[in-house]
């Protein structure tokens, strides 16, 4: 099987592991920078070119598309899809998951529990927005933020008003969310492949912080998840129509709450913590689904 990995940096852990896992199972792998792909959109002879050459047909494409290049990255992936390549996460699903507001709306519609959340663009009535989510303490986020950037814990009403007013000056979309104190700076990252949670870790924030992101200095350990948490993680990934997803869950007194569904979850922290060959599981999923029938069905 010929597999393309779409990534701006092939030296990253996740890309290297996926490449190794694919090669170990006898596949040919090429890492392509999606921003260097350019496309001929033609009803008679569509194609993708890369650094001066027309690309051959790939049986499957693994998107490792960063948030900053979502628009062009998903456009390139969509072109591969139109040419009959099987995508490990479809372009439309990635775009859906990257839209935090749309994601939360879809999860809520499916009855998946979330922290109480409000969203606004430059709200005129900051006080009412704070009341809407139950008052302080609360978390204020920029909708476009990633890896804990643009996330502030406001412990008092006055602090919340100050943060919201400051964000309002950025002319940005603001997300205001209840603070789950009982989570104590921890969350659970469930790695879903298909209809299975293949690994789970607990991420604990570093001292003095409440953001558990490993990129922000959080510490990971193996997590034992409940059947309810497993079911919610799988349901959240299905709601986003993602074959591979990192589902972040907070353990609240009222039950597990989904914080986020990540369409391009990093493998380093969770593989090194659990010792599970997640990259291999992803390749085996591709082997089961990147079939000749799929290629014919999609016109490749």
UniProtKB/Swiss-Prot annotation:
GO terms for biological process: protein modification process; SOS response; translation. Pfam families: RimK, Rimk_N. GO terms for cellular component: cytoplasm. It comes from the Bacteria. SUPFAM superfamilies: Glutathione synthetase ATP-binding domain-like. Coiled coil: none annotated. Residues 104-287 form the ATP-grasp domain. The keyword RNA-binding does not apply. Mn(2+) 2 binds at residues 260, 262. Mg(2+) 1 binds at residues 248, 260. Mn(2+) 1 binds at residues 248, 260. ATP binds at residues 141, 178-179, 187, 211-213. Its EC number is 6.3.2.-. Binds 2 magnesium or manganese ions per subunit. Keywords: ATP-binding, Ligase, Magnesium, Manganese, Metal-binding, Nucleotide-binding, Protein biosynthesis. Its cofactor is Mg(2+); Mn(2+). GO terms for molecular function: ATP binding; metal ion binding; ribosomal S6-glutamic acid ligase activity. The keyword Metal-binding applies. Mg(2+) 2 binds at residues 260, 262. Belongs to the RimK family. An L-glutamate ligase that catalyzes the ATP-dependent post-translational addition of glutamate residues to the C-terminus of ribosomal protein bS6 (RpsF). Is also able to catalyze the synthesis of poly-alpha-glutamate in vitro, via ATP hydrolysis from unprotected glutamate as substrate. The number of glutamate residues added to either RpsF or to poly-alpha-glutamate changes with pH. This is Ribosomal protein bS6--L-glutamate ligase. The gene is rimK.
């Amino acid at each position: 099987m010929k597999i393309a990995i779409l990534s701006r940096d092939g030296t990253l852990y996740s890309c290297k592991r996926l490449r190794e896992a694919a090669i170990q199972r006898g596949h040919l792998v090429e890492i392509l920078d999606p921003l260097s792909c350019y496309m001929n959109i033609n009803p008679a002879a569509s194609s993708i070119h890369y650094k001066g050459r027309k690309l051959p047909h790939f049986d499957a494409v693994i998107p490792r598309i960063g948030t900053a290049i979502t628009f062009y990255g998903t456009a390139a992936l969509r072109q591969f899809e139109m040419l009959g390549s099987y995508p490990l996460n479809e372009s439309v699903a990635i775009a859906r998951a990257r839209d935090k507001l749309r994601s939360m709306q879809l999860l809520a519609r499916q009855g998946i529990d979330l922290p109480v959340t409000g969203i606004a663009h430059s709200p005129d009535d900051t006080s009412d927005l704070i009341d809407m989510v139950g008052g302080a303490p609360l978390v204020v986020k920029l909708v476009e933020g990633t890896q804990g950037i643009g996330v502030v814990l406001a412990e008092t009403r006055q602090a919340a008003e100050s943060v919201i007013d400051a964000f309002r000056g950025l002319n940005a979309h603001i997300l205001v969310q209840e603070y789950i104190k009982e989570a104590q700076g921890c969350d659970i990252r469930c790695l879903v492949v298909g209809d299975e949670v293949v690994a789970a870790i607990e991420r604990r924030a570093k001292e003095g912080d409440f953001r558990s992101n490993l990129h922000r200095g959080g510490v990971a350990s193996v997590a034992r998840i409940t059947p309810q948490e497993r079911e919610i993680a799988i349901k959240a990934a299905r709601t986003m129509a993602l074959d591979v997803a990192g589902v972040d869950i907070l353990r609240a007194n009222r039950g597990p709450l989904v914080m986020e569904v990540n369409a391009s979850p990093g493998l380093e922290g969770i593989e090194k913590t659990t010792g599970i060959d997640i990259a291999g599981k992803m390749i085996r999923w591709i082997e089961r689904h990147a079939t000749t029938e799929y290629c014919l069905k999609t016109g490749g």
